[in-house]
């Protein structure tokens, strides 16, 4: 006698326990019931492009091409045959080796700061960097107790002294030493252009009117510390003392994270980098060694002298080349080690020596901050770069450096012929991303053709994908997004209740990982399905 069970709907059938009895329909004895499936999957990535632009593209729109890896993984699913030829399942898929690489040589900078693209048949021309000459920006260094006390004690030139010299000085001229201290030790100009009237008379720097007076943490914690009065007068010793103490407190509260030696080294390195292409034309060697963080007082002094000599040699090389007053003024930095540092350096204690090094380095940084001689040299060098003869020499030098780099690269290749192919490939490529993905989907399948032992089926699915891994060799936060898929496969009846599914599928991601990459894999899988 035939057993007939009516199925109210496909979804209600999914609620049947996996131990439910099979459903026999018709003379063929076709069974409906739960099944489990396990398999392996592999494929390729489609629809993903590099986030990096191709520097050879003049319009700046083309992205670099990627070399993609072949993702692989496994699948695990549970489902139900809900009607003859129709199945519904819930499955999980894990994919790894979702990788992409860009050729390392596609984006690189050569020794003269040129960014270029690898050429194919000589079609891609190098993109040359335009050398911009801008003096290093001033860096405000912490004001030490010794420098603070020195500033407080700076006297004004008295009215009597100016009268005895037949000079009638105003208050600012009498306070010239104090104004110089503000510039050299605090990096502040006493007078600046009026922002409301740039062509009008200069006004007292508003910064000076906003410097809290005295200790930033006064005893008793008053609600607010006083600022200099609106009628601030630099020759007034009481107001000057409060200003210096306030500046020293603020400079130490907002001091740079790097040590004074590191700040000095970076400034000198920038200057050397700025002038190197012109020094090469003049045949002047530019040192490539920076100050160590543990530089001694003597090393700092020698570095400042080296900088002075190099700038003067460069100026002298081009003196008279442009005519006029260009390169006419000698470079004399005249770095003098602070007296306080000299006294500290004479001690034998390590702490005293470290303090002396910091004091000397800070003094050197202050000397370079807004240095008029260096600023004028930069202006002259900017004019020099526009000269036709110098332009031609720069192009010739760049071409020579390109040739040297090419020859060096060929020599390196010959030396590396003994290395393994795998190692070579590793050096030729640069990872763009390396990801793994866990996908959970609900899928519906329908047979489109059935024979005694084989059936061809199609299916659709939707679900969520969780992606993690690295982009540009940096770990990313896990990304979750919607996905949809379509599949076409063949089911082979290998034994009673056992089927082998060979399936091809495509999965589409609706969102981008890190707003850069849309991972759309094209996959092939082999699974074993067992009907209970």
From Swiss-Prot:
It holds the Pfam family TSA. GO terms for cellular component: plasma membrane. It comes from the Bacteria. Residues 1-22 form the signal peptide. The chain crosses the membrane at residues 67-87, 480-500. Gene3D superfamilies: 2.40.160.20. It is found in: Cell membrane. It is a multi-pass membrane protein. Its main location: membrane. This is 56 kDa type-specific antigen.
């Amino acid at each position: 006698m035939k057993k007939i069970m009516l199925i109210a709907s496909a979804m209600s059938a999914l609620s049947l326990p996996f131990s439910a009895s099979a459903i026999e329909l018709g003379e063929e004895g076709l069974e409906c019931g739960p099944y489990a499936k396990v398999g392996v999957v592999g494929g390729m990535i489609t629809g993903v492009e590099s986030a990096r632009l191709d520097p050879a593209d003049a319009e700046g729109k083309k992205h670099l091409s990627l070399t993609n890896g072949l993702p692989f993984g496994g699948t695990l699913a549970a489902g139900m045959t809900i009607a003859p030829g129709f199945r519904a399942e819930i499955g999980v898929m894990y994919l790894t080796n979702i990788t992409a690489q860009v050729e390392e040589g596609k984006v690189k900078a050569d020794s003269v700061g040129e960014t270029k693209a690898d050429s194919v048949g000589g079609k891609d021309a190098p993109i040359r960097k335009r050398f911009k000459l801008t003096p290093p920006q001033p860096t405000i260094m912490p004001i030490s107790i010794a420098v603070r006390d020195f500033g407080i004690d700076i006297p004004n030139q008295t009215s009597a002294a100016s009268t005895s010299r037949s000079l009638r000085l105003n208050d600012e001229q009498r306070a010239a030493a104090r104004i110089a201290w503000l510039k050299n030790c605090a990096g502040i100009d006493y007078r600046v252009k009026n922002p409301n009237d740039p062509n009008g008379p200069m006004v007292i720097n508003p910064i000076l009117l906003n410097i809290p007076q005295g200790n930033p943490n006064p005893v008793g914690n008053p609600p607010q510390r006083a600022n200099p009065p609106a009628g601030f007068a630099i020759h007034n010793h009481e107001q000057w003392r409060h200003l210096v103490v306030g500046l020293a407190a603020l400079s130490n509260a907002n001091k740079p994270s790097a040590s004074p030696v590191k700040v000095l080294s970076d400034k000198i390195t920038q200057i050397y980098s700025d002038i190197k292409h012109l020094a090469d034309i003049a045949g002047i060697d530019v040192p490539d060694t920076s100050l160590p963080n543990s530089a001694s007082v003597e090393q700092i002094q020698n570095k400042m002298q080296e900088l002075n000599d190099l700038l003067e040699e460069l100026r002298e090389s081009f003196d008279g080349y442009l005519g006029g007053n260009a390169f006419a003024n000698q470079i004399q930095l005249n770095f003098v080690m602070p007296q306080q540092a000299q006294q500290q350096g004479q001690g034998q204690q390590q702490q005293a020596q470290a303090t002396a090094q910091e004091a000397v380095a800070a003094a050197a940084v202050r000397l370079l901050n807004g240095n008029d001689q260096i600023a004028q040299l930069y202006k002259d060098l900017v004019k020099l770069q526009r000269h036709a003869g110098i332009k031609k020499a720069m192009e010739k030098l760049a071409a020579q450096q390109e040739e040297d780099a090419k020859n060096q690269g060929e020599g390196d290749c010959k030396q590396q012929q003994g290395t393994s192919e795998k190692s070579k490939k590793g050096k030729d490529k640069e990872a763009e991303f390396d990801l793994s993905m866990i996908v959970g989907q609900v899928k519906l399948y329908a047979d489109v053709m059935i024979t005694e032992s084989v059936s061809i089926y199609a299916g659709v699915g939707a679900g969520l994908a969780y992606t993690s891994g690295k982009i540009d060799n940096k770990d990313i936060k896990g990304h979750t997004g919607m996905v949809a898929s379509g599949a076409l496969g063949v089911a082979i009846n290998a034994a009673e209740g056992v089927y082998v599914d060979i399936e091809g599928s495509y999965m589409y991601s609706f969102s981008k990982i890190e707003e850069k990459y849309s991972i759309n894999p094209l996959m092939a899988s082999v699974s074993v399905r067992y009907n209970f």
